[in-house]
């Protein structure tokens, strides 16, 4: 059993098949904490959830700057899972073929900043910013 403590102070119980999916739901809903019940109950902060999902690299969700480093294959795949996007849905969202999404998810080439940024905004992990 899992529960989220949301930013408005409310508590929401969620159904998830495992801890990984509960953590993804916590990110999707921008929860402050994820409560994990069971034999050894615990609470995870939003930062701990990002760390566990390997989405905690400094600068990963920042606006573009010279020297920006493209996401790793693992970061890209995890973002697709958090956003609940298939390759075809992600491709339609950002205007590329699903084959291109699959190639990036398979480690062929680097994900362009614009694609990464659109997907992070869609997932709710970054805000649209003005230059």
Residue ranges, per PLM feature:
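N-terminal flexible/basic segments that precede or flank functional cores
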Residues: 1-69
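Extracellular attachment/recognition segments
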Residues: 15, 19, 81-84, 89
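Short, amphipathic alpha-helical "recognition" segments used to contact nucleic acids or chromatin
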Residues: 67-85
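DNA-binding alpha-helical recognition surfaces that contact promoter or target DNA
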Residues: 78, 92, 103
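Short alpha-helical DNA-recognition segment
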Residues: 84-100
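Catalytic cores of nucleotide-sugar-dependent glycosyltransferases that transfer UDP/GDP/TDP-activated
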Residues: 89, 102, 107-110
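DNA major-groove recognition helix of helix-turn-helix
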Residues: 94, 104-105, 115, 123
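DNA major-groove recognition helix of helix-turn-helix/homeodomain DNA-binding modules
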Residues: 110-131
């Amino acid at each position: 059993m899992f529960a989220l403590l949301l930013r408005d102070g409310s508590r929401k119980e969620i159904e998830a098949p495992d801890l990984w999916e509960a953590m993804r739901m916590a990110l999707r809903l921008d929860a402050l904490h994820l409560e994990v019940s069971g034999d050894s109950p615990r609470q995870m902060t939003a930062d701990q959830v990002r760390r566990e999902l390997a989405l905690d690299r400094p600068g990963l969700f920042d606006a573009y700057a010279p020297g920006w480093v493209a996401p790793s294959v693992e970061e890209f795949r995890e973002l697709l899972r958090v956003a609940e996007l298939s390759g075809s849905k992600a491709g339609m969202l950002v205007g590329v073929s699903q084959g291109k999404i699959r190639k990036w998810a398979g480690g062929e080439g680097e994900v362009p900043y614009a694609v990464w940024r659109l997907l992070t905004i869609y997932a709710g992990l970054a805000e649209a910013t003005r230059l």
